[in-house]
Amino acid sequence: MDPQDCTCAAGDSCSCAGSCKCKNCRCQSCRKSCCSCCPASCSNCAKGCVCKEPSSSKCSCCH
């Protein structure tokens, strides 16, 4: 199970797996993995984001 918080500093890359679901992840390289339909630049990612459809480019927190 993934940790609640990734251990890296904000903006740094980290070793989270592609399936990482860290809820408070601050890593630019990992953030996009917290919700597959969020863009990597989404600052709200991992805050209850829900993909609107499977394989969708839209999610509830960034669009």
Swiss-Prot record:
A divalent metal cation 4 binds at residues 34-35, 45, 49. A divalent metal cation 6 binds at residues 38, 42, 45, 62. Keywords: Metal-binding, Metal-thiolate cluster. A divalent metal cation 5 binds at residues 35, 37-38, 51. Metallothioneins have a high content of cysteine residues that bind various heavy metals. Belongs to the metallothionein superfamily. Type 1 family. Residues 31-63 are annotated as: Alpha. One of its GO terms (cellular component) is cytoplasm. A divalent metal cation 3 binds at residues 16, 20, 25, 30. This is Metallothionein-2. A divalent metal cation 2 binds at residues 8, 14, 16, 27. A divalent metal cation 7 binds at residues 51, 59, 61-62. It holds the Pfam family Metallothio. It comes from the Eukaryota. Gene3D superfamilies: Metallothionein Isoform II. PROSITE patterns: METALLOTHIONEIN_VRT (PS00203). GO terms for biological process: cellular response to cadmium ion; cellular response to copper ion; cellular response to zinc ion; detoxification of copper ion; intracellular zinc ion homeostasis; response to lipopolysaccharide. Residues 1-30 are annotated as: Beta. GO terms for molecular function: zinc ion binding. The keyword Chloroplast does not apply. InterPro entries: Metalthion_dom_sf, Metalthion_dom_sf_vert, Metalthion_vert, Metalthion_vert_metal_BS. Class I metallothioneins contain 2 metal-binding domains: four divalent ions are chelated within cluster A of the alpha domain and are coordinated via cysteinyl thiolate bridges to 11 cysteine ligands. Cluster B, the corresponding region within the beta domain, can ligate three divalent ions to 9 cysteines. A divalent metal cation 1 binds at residues 6, 8, 22, 25.
